[in-house]
Amino acid sequence: MSEVVYGGGDSLELDALAVYSHPDDAELTCAGTLLKLKSQGRLTGVVDVTRGEMGTRGTPEQRFEEAREAARLLRLDVRVNLDQPDGHVFVTDEARTALVRVIRTYRPKVILTAHWDDPHPDHAATARLAREAARLASMRRYDEAAGQGAAPVPALAHAAYSRLVAPSFIVDVSEFVEEKLRAILAHRSQFYDPSSKEPVTRISDEGFLKQLESRWRYAGSLIDVAAGEAYYVREALNVEDPVELLTRPMNIYS
């Protein structure tokens, strides 16, 4: 059953909603974008599809509190957990209905999510779940008994993490790197701790955050800034002012 982790409110309509599989996924992937949007006065939220209970480190209870603290640091307007089974995320009718209800409640203009070719099965399934729920939320007779009414179809932007995915756009997050790191490290059970007796995982390895920062720097270098977050949009982008778009800073060697 879905649970509000932080914030909320029935009349809240979001500009951007990040939909990711596990607590900490949104922080690792799009925290800079969420922070930038907040600095512009936008309303933002996160959906964690699972509680991360299959993770090697930390308990679901710890991860719940860490997600709440990270939401505070990101200044989110709402954070929701869909309570789907970790390691078993599939595009089921139950999962679609749960996410449709969140979309109809908060009516986001944009959904940020994983890419459907992500090597983690939960991440790939979450990308497909987000796409299907975004469309179904606009269908008046889908889950009609819940009494919510249809919502406009939000645009979807997928994280462009792999070298095989060419970004459609990159967000300059140079000003928000330190805040992003603080939000990531709010999930303290998951990352490097020299005193921890728990098994070492890829993300708890001492060098993981440096590797992550290298990715942000690389994405930033493609648009000639210090740090960036890259996204892929499957649909063609409708550009109102090509001069404004094409005269923004970019790296001609990218």
Regions found by a protein language model. Give the residues of each.
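Metal-dependent de-N-acetylase/amidase catalytic core
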Residues: 1-17, 90-254
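Active-site rim/loop-helix segments in enzyme catalytic domains that contact anionic ligands
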Residues: 1-106, 244-249
